[in-house]
Design a protein with these regions (language model features):
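Rossmann-fold NAD(P)-binding glycine/threonine-rich loop
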Residues: 98-113, 236-279
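Short acidic-hydrophobic, aromatic-tinged amphipathic segments that line or gate anion-handling sites
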Residues: 43-50, 193-197
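Residues in the short beta-alpha loop(s) of Rossmann-like NAD(P)-binding domains
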Residues: 11, 34, 100, 178-179, ...
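Rossmann-like adenosine-cofactor binding region
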Residues: 62-66, 79-91, 186-261
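NAD(P)-binding Rossmann-fold cofactor-contacting core
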Residues: 25-40, 169-189
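Glycine-rich adenosine-cofactor-binding loop
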Residues: 6-15, 21, 146-166
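Glycine/serine-rich phosphate-binding loop and adjoining beta1-alpha1 elements at the start
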Residues: 59-147, 257, 276
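Phosphate-coordination loops involved in phosphoryl transfer and adenosine-cofactor binding
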Residues: 2-4, 91, 146-149, 229
Length: 285
């Protein structure tokens, strides 16, 4: 049974997570947040040696940006991952988001779980991602979403939520996908369903194009057909789904909008992480 939790590094998402876990009865400490960590809900630890003395160690998302230092933007000093891995108890459960191979190697011998790979988190994160994408579209286009033609490329978690929200705002929603089963669902929900091979035939009349597929879909052939007044918003993780250099050469407006949950809705994102970690703790016993 896990009782003590230490949240080390991160941003407002992790502070939200710490507060919520405390409210559920866990004894929570935080480290690596500076003055932003003051709260009656948890203990703001100043000594990293004491901070790591917990049943559960929760690291940020991503754990690191360079495979050497912990991602701790609020902390005045560098927290070396090697130092951290050396002082955490071997019997602690270590949780982190978007854990790289280098981090897994450092924590060899530990029970370490990537909470950002959990399906429930990815599904719920689709909502702040979709809302953030629409917010960007509203700020980058001179027209309303209502009555706009919007193409959503890909009908996975984000594509499903995004299409529904756009439809609710009155957009004329086109959905492209590779699988015919996805196209069938898109048709059932009242969208204009097109196969990825047919994107080039409808791309010119789109006002906003949202890509959710992390593979090259919007290549040179398709980009040449896009209206110069359109906006392309790429929500896919690296390498993205747009030929960015060709789009730049053509003078197209492309926004690669990564990590929207943490930027647009950090408190909601923190709540989603908390719910996911609570599920993990129940499973791990």
């Amino acid at each position: 049974m896990y009782k003590t939790v230490s949240v080390i590094g991160g941003d407002l998402r992790q502070l939200t997570l710490a507060k919520m876990l405390s409210q559920e009865g866990y004894l929570v400490s935080v480290y690596g947040f500076g003055k932003d960590s003051l709260s009656e809900n948890y203990n703001a630890e100043k000594d990293i040696q004491k901070a790591v003395c917990a049943d559960v160690i929760i690291l940020p998302v991503p754990v690191t940006l360079d495979s050497k230092k912990l991602n701790a933007p609020f902390h005045e000093e560098t927290i070396a991952l090697k130092e951290l891995s050396d002082i955490i108890k071997k019997d602690s459960l270590v949780l982190g988001g978007r854990i790289s191979k280098e981090v897994y190697d450092l924590f060899e011998g530990y029970k370490i779980i990537d909470y950002y790979k959990r399906e429930e988190l990815m599904i719920k994160n689709a909502v702040p991602t979709a809302e953030g994408a629409i917010e960007i579209a509203m700020g980058e286009t001179p027209v309303t979403i209502s009555d706009s033609r919007c193409l959503v490329v890909g009908y996975g978690r984000i594509g499903k939520v995004l299409s529904r929200l756009l439809q609710g705002l009155g957009a004329d929603v086109y959905v492209s996908a590779r699988k015919y089963s996805d196209l069938a669902w898109a048709d059932v929900w009242g969208y204009r369903a097109i196969h990825n091979d047919e994107i080039k035939d409808c791309i010119q009349k789109q006002d906003v194009i949202f890509n959710t597929v992390p593979a090259l879909i919007l290549d040179e052939d398709i980009l040449k057909r896009i209206n110069p007044d359109s906006v392309i918003i790429d929500l896919a993780s690296k390498p993205g789904g747009v030929d960015f250099q060709k789009a730049k050469d053509l003078g197209l407006k492309v926004i690669w909008a990564l990590s929207l949950p943490g930027k647009c809705a950090p408190i909601t994102s923190g709540k989603i992480i908390k719910e996911t970690i609570t599920n993990i703790l129940k499973e791990e016993g």
